[in-house]
């Protein structure tokens, strides 16, 4: 009897009221029918896929305490002298309009032009080519057009070149500074006094610039070929000059040979020379040539990063050595507490860094040569005692009991049998008896 039948007999409801209400309160899940043509296993994998991006609940912005509004307000610009009143939109916070000067008034910059009096002009500024009216008009245009001499030359009533206008303006300023100063030392460091305007140099500069801008493609190609040929000749001369200079490592190697007892007039055994590495016997001419070529190519660039130049010089200096030697140089730098790349790569620091790398490389070459010398000396010592037999000091003399002082009899050499032949031959006890013949009877 099930639970439902017992409830029917007792007259109890099949489902409690609380459970019925709970079922009513729960939302019913939407049932999705499996599409046709898709298996049940595949369709089960499609449900419950995790979202590609995590859902982020955006927090509600708290209500702002400030009340912001945009209003159409009037303003005046301090750069203008006529007190013109204009209008623009302004951001107003809590109904309090902004105060202060116009925000774009700070960009109104003007050039400070020197002013002179009639007395100063008569005493210091008179010129046979320029009149006072022309000079006054020039300074007025310089004030209005902010020293834009191209615009001034276009507006000037008298036909004057840009160079002539510049020369007159700067000469008047220098004369006024010199006349108003109490001593020449007071204005000696002024830019107009230290670097005066040179009209001849300016004309020559513009003439050269116009020639460069007006040349044809054929002339540009020809100039490029000339520059490339000059670069090649410079590199060849520097490489030849570097190759002719004596190497520091070669001089130190020669001094070490003298200290070891090698006389310059005598010849050294070929075995010792063959054992020494090439970097310790002869100077690295190829490395110096690469170093000079790299230096010449960097100079032709005119503008380059100091770290890039240092890397190129280090690669050129390490081109003739192996990777193991380069790692030993870097390890030595780290042991000395020196960075592989300088933190402040000035010219002096880079030169000292390259010099330190050269000295470390020379030290490693000398250590390698010393190691070869020591191995050569040890081999000579071992070879001198190899021909002499060792004295049997610890061996006890035991006479032969069979010889009694005479020579041991030499055993007769037995004939060797092949392997496995003796084992295959049966013993005499196991031999089968020979059959008797008629002649034996």
From Swiss-Prot:
Its main location: nucleus. Gene3D superfamilies: Homeodomain-like. It is found in: Nucleus. GO terms for molecular function: DNA binding. Residues 126-175 form the SANT domain. Component of the SWR1 chromatin-remodeling complex and of the NuA4 histone acetyltransferase complex. Interacts with EAF1A, EAF1B, TAF14 and TAF14B. This is SWR1-complex protein 4. The gene is SWC4.
């Amino acid at each position: 009897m099930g639970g439902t039948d017992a409830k029917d007999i007792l007259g109890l409801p099949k489902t409690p009221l609380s459970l019925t209400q709970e079922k009513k309160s729960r939302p019913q899940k939407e049932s999705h029918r499996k599409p046709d043509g898709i298996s049940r296993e595949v369709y089960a994998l499609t449900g419950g896929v995790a979202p590609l991006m995590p859902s982020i609940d955006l927090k509600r912005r708290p209500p702002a305490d400030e009340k912001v509004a945009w209003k159409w307000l009037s303003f005046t610009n301090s750069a203008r002298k006529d007190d013109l009143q204009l209008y623009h939109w302004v951001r107003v916070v809590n109904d309090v309009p902004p105060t202060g000067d116009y925000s774009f008034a700070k960009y109104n910059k003007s050039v400070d032009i020197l002013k002179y009096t009639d007395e100063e002009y008569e005493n210091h500024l008179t010129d046979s080519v320029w009149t006072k009216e022309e000079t006054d008009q020039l300074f007025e245009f310089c004030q209005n057009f902010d020293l834009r001499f191209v615009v001034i030359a276009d507006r000037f009533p008298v036909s004057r070149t840009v160079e002539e206008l510049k020369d007159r303006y700067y000469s008047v300023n220098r004369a006024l500074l010199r006349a108003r100063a109490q001593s020449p030392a007071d204005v000696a460091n002024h830019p107009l006094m230290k670097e005066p305007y040179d009209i001849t140099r300016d004309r020559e500069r513009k003439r050269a610039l116009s020639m460069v801008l007006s040349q044809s493609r054929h002339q540009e190609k020809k100039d490029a070929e000339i520059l490339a040929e000059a670069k090649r000749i410079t590199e060849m001369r520097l490489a030849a000059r570097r190759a002719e200079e004596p190497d520091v490592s070669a001089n130190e190697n020669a001094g070490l040979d003298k200290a070891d007892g090698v006389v310059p007039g005598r010849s050294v055994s070929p075995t010792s020379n063959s054992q020494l590495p090439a970097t310790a016997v002869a100077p690295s001419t190829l490395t110096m040539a690469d170093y000079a070529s790299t230096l010449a190519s960097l100079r032709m660039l005119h503008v380059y990063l100091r770290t890039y130049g240092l890397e190129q010089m280090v690669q050129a200096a390490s081109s003739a050595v192996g990777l193991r030697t380069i790692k030993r140089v870097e390890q030595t730098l780290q042991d000395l507490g020196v960075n592989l790349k300088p933190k402040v790569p000035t010219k002096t620091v880079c030169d000292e860094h390259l010099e330190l790398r050269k000295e470390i490389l020379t030290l490693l070459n000398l250590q390698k040569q010393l190691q070869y010398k020591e191995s050569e000396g040890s081999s000579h010592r071992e070879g001198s005692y190899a021909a002499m037999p060792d004295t049997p000091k610890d061996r006890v003399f035991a006479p032969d009991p069979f010889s009694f002082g005479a020579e041991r009899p030499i055993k007769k050499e037995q004939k060797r049998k092949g392997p496995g032949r003796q084992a295959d031959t049966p013993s005499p006890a196991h031999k089968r008896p020979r059959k008797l013949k008629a002649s034996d009877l």
